[in-house]
């Protein structure tokens, strides 16, 4: 958490406020944040009212309570590169969104291990993703390529993200889906803007995972779950549509 906070306070863009909602952590996270509060006026700790909501709804609860023209999600063990906020705001301004138009910027990132050794200099390249090829509602619903810790979005995007559907799997997937469905503007920064720690069991993106070593039963179960999610959000109308989309995306990624 200290590395994350230090990277935040090392940003070239400084006009921001950090809102924190602790979701029942049992370590010394809050005490560390409180120590930073003594030196920095722009940290606000939100009362969790004794509720443990899980990662998804913890982010959404915090988002709902904060009023701001722009929002960014931040994970406690990632490291932001110094120009991250500055570069994303510049990219957002180029979208020319008015107050009635939801807008979103997402970026590439570097995958690192727990000691910040680089595992992949480009997350997008490692998963065979290009925003020049994939940048639509159905593709986001399928791939989940917009990662929460790289997102910057406006107040209108926040407003249309509520209420939250029960079928939504994660905050980043859901907010991005809502923006696409509302015909909002989505842009990106191609260069990595942060270091994302890859732990043993964590997953970046909702369906970005290797199928190697999985038996047919497991694969079919995962496909069924993904299809149902995409049907619920309106990305596909039938299992046949889902299979066609899956094949199209698979073939496109071979050339990236």
Protein language model regions, located:
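Nucleotide-sugar donor-binding/catalytic module of glycosyltransferases
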Residues: 1-209
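General helical structural elements
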Residues: 25, 223, 250-252
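Intrinsic low-complexity, intrinsically disordered segments enriched in polar/basic residues
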Residues: 53, 63, 115, 214-217, ...
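Enrichment for repetitive, rod-forming helical segments
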Residues: 91, 226, 233, 253-255
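Membrane-interface aromatic/basic loop that binds lipid-linked glycans or pyrophosphate carriers
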Residues: 235-256
């Amino acid at each position: 958490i200290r590395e994350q906070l230090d990277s935040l306070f090392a940003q070239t863009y400084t006009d921001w406020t950090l809102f924190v909602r602790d979701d029942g952590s049992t370590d010394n996270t809050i005490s560390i944040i409180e120590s930073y509060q003594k030196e920095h006026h722009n940290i606000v700790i939100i009362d969790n009212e004794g509720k443990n909501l899980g990662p998804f709804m913890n982010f959404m609860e915090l988002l709902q309570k904060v009023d701001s023209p722009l929002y960014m999600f931040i994970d406690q063990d990632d490291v932001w590169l110094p120009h991250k906020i500055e570069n994303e705001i510049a990219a957002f301004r180029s979208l020319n969104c008015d107050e009635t138009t939801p807008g979103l910027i997402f970026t590439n990132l570097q995958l690192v291990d727990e000691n910040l050794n680089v595992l992949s200099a480009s997350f997008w390249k490692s998963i065979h993703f290009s925003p020049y090829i994939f940048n639509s509602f159905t593709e986001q619903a399928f791939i989940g390529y917009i990662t929460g810790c790289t997102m910057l979005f406006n107040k209108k995007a926040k407003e249309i993200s509520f209420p939250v559907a029960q079928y939504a799997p994660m905050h980043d997937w859901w907010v991005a889906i809502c923006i696409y469905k509302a015909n909002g503007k989505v842009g990106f920064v191609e260069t990595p803007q942060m270091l994302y720690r890859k732990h043993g069991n964590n997953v970046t993106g909702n369906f970005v995972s290797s199928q190697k070593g999985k038996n047919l039963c497991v694969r079919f179960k995962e496909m069924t779950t993904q299809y149902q999610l995409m049907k619920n959000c309106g990305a596909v109308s039938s299992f046949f549509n889902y299979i066609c989309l899956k094949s199209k995306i698979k073939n496109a990624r071979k050339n990236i």
